[in-house]
Amino acid sequence: RAPADLVPLGPRTPVYAMDALAEHQQAIDVLILCGGSKDDLPAQGPQLAAMFNTVDSFDTHARIPEYFAAVDEPARANGKTALISIGWDPGMFSINRLYGEALLPDGVTYTFWGKGLSQGHSDAVRRVPGVKAGVQYTLPSPEAIERVRSGARPELSTREKHTRECFVVLAEGADAATVEQAIVGMPNYFADYDTTVNFISEDELRRDHQRMPHGGFVIRSGNTSEPHAQVIEYSLQLESNPEFTASVLVAYARAAYRLNQQGQIGAKTAFDVAPGLLSIKSAGQLREELL
């Protein structure tokens, strides 16, 4: 977006064009990259890691190893530190999956997402003929979560772990039954899930579905001995997915600067960052107040 189109929250916040970024290398301690994982970050991540310490939220899980390698080379060559795939998944959920495996090696890890608004699935709903507007939420199955929490280590199918719920505004003259069948039978999006379609008014959509909540659970179910089942659980309930992700990025920006000052250069992930580096408090304060 053009700088003139942006309205900062505060009058003292400067806004510059992307083309002018290189002129500010001496003034920026850490650059937080907020671009998308599909098209923006694969190009921007390596390019900007050659000039700045960076933090990003690249979240295409299957491509993280190749993205790490692409960012690591320019960052290392220029003495910069680049924290990649920072957020809540990947990020906070990743850390808790690691903790679960390390602490309970005899076990199974389960990740549930939601309740949350899915932007990609919402877009798919809006492309169905007869749909004027709509959103889609991913909901974790309470029954599946309770089975996991019991320590039983169930094998769960995609349909058993999550359901999907759509809120749709019909276009004028559209047939509700036809639209519903087009949605619930859509391959790669809804056909493999139990999907509920709710038809609502435009006013209801504006009133009730403008925020971007999300969240989920990471649960490790395992045994430390045959008779003793153990369950580790980490959960998030977020009213604003982007605001929470931003909070995580800012905390890790603090760590990126500190790592760079220690001479730890190149690409890093959440697995490489000691928790104390995230805090504004000194190591002594943390030992006294939180340990």
Where are these regions (language model features)?
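NAD(P)-dependent Rossmann-like dehydrogenase/reductase catalytic/cofactor-binding core
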Residues: 230-291
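Rossmann-fold NAD(P)-binding glycine/threonine-rich loop
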Residues: 58-84
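General beta-strand structural signal in soluble alpha/beta enzymes
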Residues: 56-57, 82-86, 112, 135-136
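Short alpha-helices
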Residues: 76-101, 249
